[in-house]
């Protein structure tokens, strides 16, 4: 797993926690392992001349492949984390070497066992590295199919107990390898929504950590216990459980399915833009996270991906896929995941995405961050006078929902102001801001005439919902899983599967009608329609309108700051306050028997 820690100029932008992202240092002498193995051959088999030449060559070739694979793997951390072209050839070479290494150890297992002394944990390390390669490839390409490949390798390690003998050796560094494997496996399972497996892995990891800290006098016990706490909180972040008849929890997927986005009507005139790149930025204080991935980032990540397809393996045992088996086109928009980046780091990745954005494509920026508010009154109302959202700095971050600037004569440095995004509006830009100061981005000016839309969260929630903020934002939950968000604001914490599926079907009907409201509107800004041709953006827009309409009808959302806003503004009477949509929301509430929490005659109540 590639980390940015050794490159201070880059953020730790992937899913790598401190404990799962460490890449071992390459050996100082590249031939030392080979020389050691040959000495082992001599000591285990008698005189060197007694060893068949073929077996000597087998061990030598294995050691070469092993050293080469480690060298290439360790080189991954030196690749730039941004840009989509510089790394591909390097990944190809690394895949090729690991393919040869994996097949080689399978074909020559007996010789390697007898002459090299190959241990099962060493086979596990090779499989773990291949799993990491697939995971890296997913992060670089956003192709969810490679998550399945990573999962297959990690599962094989567990099923075949490759690390089972590690605990019998008095080598704490080997146990740490095992613990890191568990942490990486958990990340992949979380991304694949395999929560049952996650729970089993957490229990096993907890037992392993307890044994590790009991046997060795270690200084990292607190860190490993923190890993357990973080993943436990992450699992429990969803506010609503869907239950089978036997009360087992149903795992719901929130990636884009074939029938997920409302279809366009025949003859509907929309733009031909497609979402190509996305920056998902998380910088909320005190929000649940695991592996440098906050709950909000996790939810938005899945909202921008299709359901994964299995890459059919041609091997009986876990093995590598040839390049010909890889998808020839990108199914998902490319994504950068930036956890608490500094301003310079964020701008570097933003500039890289902007530079490589293809023609007729859209760049999406998702900001889940603490609000930065201006202090005092300004003589002007420019793009740097309304504050923005927090970016990281080297100093300690003040706890709380907002950072207030002390020096009134200067703007906040560690802040992404709306004006900072102006240069990137030269290309189609779709912005989502989930923050207590999201309205700062309502004051945009479209300088270059390119399509530009900003979806802005409420700046405050009713008191009854504020204590849930650590488990993720309600606004982002609506964009990721609108039915779960609807249940949550309706006071429901669980639901039977049959009713859930019935409501999902009705919600699909609501989305279709919202799409018609947008495309039939005579007063809507054309920017919305220019983005409407892309499935991901179409679904985000319909969910945004559903979210806004729901909050406007709900009895506890009574302040203006409780409602989402947008730039450009949507025509309320044709969208978020449309009587036809309001009727649908009341009908959904009736299905759930929660109609009493919504106003019946909403227009009259304003």
Swiss-Prot record:
Example of a GO biological process term: negative regulation of Rho protein signal transduction
Modified residues (Phosphotyrosine): 64
Family: Belongs to the SCAI family.
RNA-binding is among the record's keywords: no
Localization of this protein: Membrane; Nucleus; Cytoplasm
Stated name of the protein: Protein SCAI
Function (record text): Tumor suppressor which functions to suppress MRTFA-induced SRF transcriptional activity. May function in the RHOA-DIAPH1 signal transduction pathway and regulate cell migration through transcriptional regulation of ITGB1.
Spans annotated as Disordered: 1-35
Domain of life: Eukaryota
Membrane spanning residue stretches: 472-492
Signal peptide residues on this chain, from the entry's feature table: none
Molecular-function GO terms, alphabetical: transcription corepressor activity
Quaternary structure annotation from Swiss-Prot or TrEMBL: Interacts with DIAPH1. Forms a nuclear ternary complex with MRTFA and SRF.
Predominant location category: membrane
Key words of the record: Cytoplasm, Membrane, Nucleus, Phosphoprotein, Repressor, Signal transduction inhibitor, Transcription, Transcription regulation, Transmembrane, Transmembrane helix
Region named Required for interaction with MRTFA: 71-173
Region Necessary to inhibit MRTFA-induced SRF transcriptional activity: start-end pairs: 1-212
């Amino acid at each position: 797993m590639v980390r940015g820690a050794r490159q201070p100029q880059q953020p730790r932008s992937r899913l790598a926690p401190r404990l799962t992202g460490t890449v071992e240092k390459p050996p100082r002498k590249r031939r030392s392992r080979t020389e050691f193995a040959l000495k082992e051959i001599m000591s285990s088999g008698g005189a060197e001349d007694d060893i068949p030449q073929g077996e000597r060559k087998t061990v030598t070739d294995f050691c070469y492949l092993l050293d080469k694979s480690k060298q290439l793997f360790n080189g991954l951390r030196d690749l730039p984390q941004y840009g989509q072209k510089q790394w591909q050839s390097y990944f190809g070479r690394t895949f090729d070497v690991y393919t040869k290494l994996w097949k080689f150890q399978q074909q020559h297992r007996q010789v390697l066992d007898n002459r090299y002394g190959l241990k099962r944990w060493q086979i596990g390390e090779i499989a773990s590295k291949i799993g990491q390669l697939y995971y890296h490839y997913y992060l670089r390409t956003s192709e969810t199919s490679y998550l399945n490949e990573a999962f297959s390798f990690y599962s094989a390690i567990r099923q075949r107990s490759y690390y089972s003998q590690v605990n019998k050796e008095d080598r704490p560094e080997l146990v740490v390898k095992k613990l890191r494997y568990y942490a990486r496996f958990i990340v992949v399972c979380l991304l694949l929504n395999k929560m049952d497996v996650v729970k089993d892995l957490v229990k096993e990891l907890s037992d392993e950590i307890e044994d590790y800290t009991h046997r060795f006098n270690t200084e990292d016990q607190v860190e490993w216990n923190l890993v357990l706490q973080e993943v436990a909180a992450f699992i429990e972040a969803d506010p609503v459980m869907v239950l089978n008849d036997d009360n087992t929890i149903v795992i719901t997927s929130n990636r884009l399915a074939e029938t997920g986005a409302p279809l366009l009507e025949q003859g509907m005139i929309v733009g031909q833009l497609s979402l190509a790149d996305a920056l998902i930025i998380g910088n909320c204080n005190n929000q649940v996270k695991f592996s440098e991935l906050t709950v909000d980032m996790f939810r938005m990540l899945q909202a921008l991906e299709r359901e994964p397809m299995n890459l059919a393996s041609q091997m009986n045992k876990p093995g590598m896929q040839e390049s010909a088996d890889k998808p020839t086109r990108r199914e998902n928009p490319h994504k950068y995941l930036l956890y608490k980046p500094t301003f310079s780091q964020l701008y570097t990745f933003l500039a890289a995405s902007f530079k490589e954005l293809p023609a007729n494509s859209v760049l999406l920026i998702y900001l889940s961050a603490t609000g930065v508010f201006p202090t005092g009154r300004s003589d002007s109302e420019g793009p740097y006078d309304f504050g923005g959202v927090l970016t990281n700095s080297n100093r300690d971050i003040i706890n709380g929902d907002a950072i207030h600037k002390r020096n009134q004569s200067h703007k906040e440095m560690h802040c992404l102001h709306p004006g900072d995004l102006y240069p990137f509006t030269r290309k189609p830009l779709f912005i989502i801001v989930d923050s207590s100061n999201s309205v700062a981005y309502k004051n945009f000016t479209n300088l270059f005439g390119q399509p530009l839309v900003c979806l802005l969260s409420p700046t405050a929630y009713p008191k009854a919902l504020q204590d849930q903020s650590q488990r993720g934002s309600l606004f982002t939950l609506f964009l990721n899983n609108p039915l779960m968000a609807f249940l949550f604001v309706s006071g429901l914490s669980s639901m039977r599967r049959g009713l859930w599926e019935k409501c999902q079907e009705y919600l699909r009907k609501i989305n279709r009608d919202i799409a018609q409201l947008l495309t039939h509107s005579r007063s809507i800004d054309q920017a919305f329609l220019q983005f409407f041709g892309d499935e991901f953006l179409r679904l985000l827009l319909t969910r945004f309108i559903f979210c806004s309409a729901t909050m406007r009808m709900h009895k506890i959302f009574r302040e203006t700051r409780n409602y989402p806003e947008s730039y450009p503004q949507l025509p309320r009477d044709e969208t978020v306050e449309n009587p036809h949509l309001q009727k649908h929301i009341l009908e959904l509430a009736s299905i759930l028997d929660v109609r009493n929490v919504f106003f019946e005659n909403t227009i009259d109540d304003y």
